[in-house]
Amino acid sequence: MNNPLVSIIVPVYNVQNSVARCLESICAQTWKNIEVILVNDGSRDESFSICEQFREKDPRIVLVDKSNSGVSETRNCGMSLARGKYVQFVDSDDYLDPDFTERLVTAAEANNADLVIAPYWICLLYTSDA
């Protein structure tokens, strides 16, 4: 298998409490040939600042700051910058297993697939007065 570039697009909007964990998981992927396109959609919290800190540490990260226009236009903005053979969308409140991208690329390459859909886990965290 060759080593195709994967463009990981992350829309960012007011996620200061979750975006660092998301970016840590992306930067720790076992598939190293990635570009990470962070598109800040006019966040009013510290999300953009957190993204800047990650961009300073990892040259694979591209950071775009734009006015708020919604998640669909934000993803499209990321797509317009993507250079990879494959595109992976990750929401900024999600985090990935270390081999997530590698498994997607392996499946796509092995099956000459145009689309790979990944399973996901939902973990609900709450406190109860009961």
Task: Give names to the regions the model predicted.
Residues M1-S128:
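Nucleotide-sugar donor-binding/catalytic module of glycosyltransferases
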